[in-house]
């Protein structure tokens, strides 16, 4: 989740922590 590009977006989309 950290250092991954789009962490904030993934967290908002999945409501959790999805490092994609």
Curated annotation (Swiss-Prot):
GO cellular component labels: extracellular region
Reactions that this protein is recorded to catalyse: 2 Mn(2+) + H2O2 + 2 H(+) = 2 Mn(3+) + 2 H2O
Principal location listed in the UniProt entry: secreted
Enzyme class: oxidoreductase
GO molecular function, one term: manganese peroxidase activity
Key words of the record: Hydrogen peroxide, Iron, Lignin degradation, Manganese, Metal-binding, Oxidoreductase, Peroxidase, Secreted
Subcellular location as annotated: Secreted
Signal peptide start and end residues: none
Any one GO biological process: hydrogen peroxide catabolic process
EC number: 1.11.1.13
Keyword Acetylation among UniProt keywords: no
Function summary: Catalyzes the oxidation of Mn(2+) to Mn(3+). The latter, acting as a diffusible redox mediator, is capable of oxidizing a variety of lignin compounds.
Family of this protein: Belongs to the peroxidase family. Ligninase subfamily.
The protein, known as: Manganese peroxidase H5
């Amino acid at each position: 989740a950290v250092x991954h590009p789009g962490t904030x977006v993934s967290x908002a989309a999945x409501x959790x922590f999805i490092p994609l």
